[in-house]
């Protein structure tokens, strides 16, 4: 016997009301020490506590509990069932309802309990992680990851924290997320991977980091573009512009070489990798803007040739 009365059983089974709508129970008879315990009672509890009481006899030799009704009455049961489903009539009758809980308050309390549960906390944490990644808040990202927040949790559009940080070009956050197990190949609802988003926004260092973290190059772009195509586009921009300083230009060309190095390693193209290393050495020895431009042109030609060879191999 679990200690529940027939009244409680009937109330719980009639329609199986959702817990979010609140659950009402009948308490025992009032006593001087029950004041603090009765603060959260429903109107039905407040009205019925003094009319129907329950007592439990001592355990017999079979260790069974016998529940004894002190004042049973069929019409009283029906009356309290009626009050259970229509608690508002207590107010209309002018009865005192200390500690009453309205249905809206019950729903709010139930919602608050759900939100403070493990699932609610997790949902809040992963949302904060995505927001922090999108706003480049690395301190919050690190703290949430240290608290075991899932880095692969996506929003309703399939976007993860890694998608946001890759699109923003934040290499530090991308590396941090990868170190905590973020999936570089996870797709959003449109089929985009973090690598694809980094490519679309021309964030070469992020692409390099994603490639090192295990990103699949064949999932870079649904249009079939690879880091080679991105490198060529980036180099074309560098060749057309002349506003960059020598160090800035050298740094951007170096980033492109690093990206291509990771890509060629994944593809297993050792011969192409050797040619790239030769170009990288030439870049390191440059001292003037003209020399950097020459290396840039050489790298652009290398990239175009590699794309042609790749296209021939795909046929």
Curated annotation (Swiss-Prot):
Superkingdom of source: Eukaryota
Per-repeat ranges for ANK: 124-153, 157-186, 190-219, 223-255
Subcellular location: Nucleus; Cytoplasm; Midbody
Gene3D superfamilies associated with the record: Ankyrin repeat-containing domain
SUPFAM superfamilies on file: Ankyrin repeat
Region (Disordered): 1-49
GO CC annotations on file: cytoplasm; midbody; nucleus
GO process annotations (BP): regulation of intracellular signal transduction
Keywords: ANK repeat, Cytoplasm, Nucleus, Repeat
InterPro entries the record matches: Ankyrin_rpt, Ankyrin_rpt-contain_sf
PROSITE patterns hit by this protein: ANK_REP_REGION, ANK_REPEAT
Task of the protein: Plays an important role in regulating intracellular signaling events associated with erythroid terminal differentiation.
Record's protein name: Ankyrin repeat domain-containing protein 54
Organism listed in the record: Danio rerio (Zebrafish)
């Amino acid at each position: 016997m679990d200690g529940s009365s027939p009244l409680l059983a009937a109330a719980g089974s009639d329609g199986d009301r959702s817990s979010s709508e609140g659950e009402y129970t009948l308490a025992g008879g009032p006593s001087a020490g029950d004041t603090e315990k009765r603060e959260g009672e429903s109107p039905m509890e407040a009205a019925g506590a003094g009319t129907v009481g329950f007592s439990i006899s001592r355990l017999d030799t079979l260790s069974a509990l016998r529940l004894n009704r002190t004042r049973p009455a069929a019409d009283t049961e029906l009356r309290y069932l009626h009050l259970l489903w229509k608690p508002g009539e207590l107010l209309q009758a002018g009865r005192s309802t200390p500690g009453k809980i309205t249905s809206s308050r019950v729903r709010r309390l139930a919602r608050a309990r759900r939100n403070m549960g493990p699932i609610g906390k997790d949902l809040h944490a992963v949302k904060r992680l995505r927001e922090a990644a999108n706003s480049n808040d690395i301190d919050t990202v690190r703290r949430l990851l240290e608290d075991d927040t899932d880095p692969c949790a996506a929003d309703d559009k399939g976007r993860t924290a890694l998608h946001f940080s890759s699109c923003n070009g934040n290499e530090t956050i991308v590396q941090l997320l990868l170190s905590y197990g973020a999936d570089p190949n996870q797709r959003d609802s449109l089929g985009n991977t973090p690598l694809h988003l980094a490519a679309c926004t021309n964030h070469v260092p992020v692409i390099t980091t994603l490639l090192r973290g295990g990103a699949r190059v064949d999932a870079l772009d649904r249009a079939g573009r690879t880091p080679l195509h991105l490198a060529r586009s980036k180099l074309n921009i560098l060749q057309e512009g002349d506003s960059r300083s020598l160090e800035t230009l050298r740094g951007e060309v170096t980033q492109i070489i690093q990206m291509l190095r990771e890509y060629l390693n994944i593809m297993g193209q050792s011969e192409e990798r050797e040619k790239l290393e030769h170009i990288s050495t030439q870049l390191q020895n440059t001292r003037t803007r003209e020399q950097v431009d020459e290396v840039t042109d050489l790298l652009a030609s290398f990239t175009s040739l590699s794309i042609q060879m790749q296209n021939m191999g795909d046929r």
